[in-house]
Structures are given as C-alpha cells and as structure tokens.
Amino acid sequence: MSKNKYNGKMRPSAGRNPKGKVSQKSLAIISVCAIILGIFITAQEYLDRHTLAASAAEATVTETLAEVVKAIPAYAQTMTAGSSEADALTDAADTLATGSFREKIDAYREVTDILEKHSSDKAAPAKALREAMSTAEDAAVAYNKEAQALNEKIVKFPYNIVAKLGGYAEFPIFSLN
C-alpha cells in the first residue's frame, strides 16, 4: 500500500489551510465584498426613498394645478366675454389640464401675468384663483427640494452606479412663478 500524504484525511480545499480554518486572505475578500454590497444596497434604498418622495411631491403639484384649472373658468367669467384675456385664460386652463409638463408651466405663467394685470381685482373668483395658485407654488417649492436632493445624490458615487443599473433618472427642476 502506498502511503497518502494526508494519512487518510481529506485533502484541504482551496483557500483553507490544512487545519480547515478560513485563511486571512479569504476572510478579507469576503469582508470587502460584504461592505461593497452593503454600500450599494444602502444607496439603492436611499434612491428608492427619495424617488418615491419626489414622485409624491410631483403628484401634489399636479393635484394643485388641477385646483387652479377648476378656479380659472369662474375668474374668466368675470371678464368681458370674448376678450383676449378671457380666451387666454380658457386656453391656459385647457393646457394646464392636458398639456405637457413644459406647456403647463408656460400656461401657468400666462395665468400669472393676467392676474398681475388685474391685481386690484378683489372679487371671490380672483381670490380663489390666487389661493389655488399660491398652493401650487408652495407644492412646486416642496417638489423642487425633493428633486434637488435626489439630483445631487444621483451624480455621486455609489449612487451614480446604482442609478444607472436601476434606471433612475434625474427629476426636472422648475419654477411656477
């Protein structure tokens, strides 16, 4: 019989010393991988949380713009029928209801310009429209804070890698006034 180098014991597996203990090198590699994985999981959770918050703030802006759309017809009725401003308000309401994001901002600014021309108007429809617009502006400010926080993180390591892999995108920053 030939003598085995290990005297009948199992051969140690790769990365282990003959006593079966995990080598320091393997332990270091496992630790580094765990730390890197933890960093990326934390980054993804952060992006998920702030994307959700920015999306909720964006939905609030949309809801407040819907309130502006509801207030516009009553204010337009206080103007002379067929006037260019009344028609512009009606068009702006349609755009705010169905337009693209950029078109909605432009329409909002048009309504703001018309309201500024009639700043002395203290009638209830004008007051209701101003209140709805003020609420929309406050919602836009809250949205911009969330979007800015997310956009600042999304370009930094490790968030940029997680953003590319996860399909996260920057949120647009805008101003209603």
Per-region residue spans from a language model:
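A helix-centric hydrophobic-segment signal that preferentially recognizes long
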Residues: 2-177
